[in-house]
Amino acid sequence: SYKENPPFSTKIQFKPDKKIFESLIPDIDRLRKRLAVASVELKDATLVLNVDDNKEIFRLDSIGYFNQECLNDSDTETTKLIDIFVEDSIESMEVKFCYSLNGTIAPRILSSVNLLPVDSGGTHVNMFLDILKELFTTKAKKAGLKFQPYDALCGLRSYITLKLTKPEFSGQTKDKLINRK
């Protein structure tokens, strides 16, 4: 658990430089998102955000983060959570997803790459959605059912996390992954 002065700790201070940033006021919500994602991936770490002597502690596991960020209050009934983990020697991908049975039908998809929340998705999200649409369309066709590919996304709740050696992003803000594979 977090202690004020632990024997093994690292303190990082963020002070924006007006030579680099347009605004000297940091985006606290973005920092919160990054700390939440980092706390999931760095399982033994406790992360603390201290703003004007108000401390927020981040120590989440992947299921807790999924439930907190991917599910809405109206998602009281869901399918079983599916967890897929694929890893090669250096890179890895984990996808957690389920379907809401009674919440909004709009899909809710969150993702991160190397501890960085990727708000606008990218190739990894598109690939996952294409796989789901193809899977459901193929199964429906074999069963003799009519099925629109987008229906595979109705009620989808998903969190995708990647660890890549050379991620490529669409811009300086790193809000969309553009790697080809």
Task: Show the residue positions of the predicted features.
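GHKL (Bergerat-fold) ATPase N-terminal catalytic module, capturing the glycine-rich phosphate-binding loop
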Residues: S1-K15, F21-E22
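Non-catalytic interaction modules of co-chaperones and other macromolecular assembly/maintenance factors
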Residues: N5, L24-R30, V37
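Domain-wide signal for the mature, well-folded portions of proteins, strongly enriched
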Residues: F8-S9, Q13, D27-L31, C70
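Generic, low-specificity signal for short hydrophobic/alpha-helical stretches with a mild N-terminal bias
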Residues: P16-D17, L110
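GHKL/Histidine-kinase-like ATPase module
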Residues: D29, A36-V37, D44, L49-D175
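A sensor for short, sequence-defined functional sites
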Residues: N179-R180
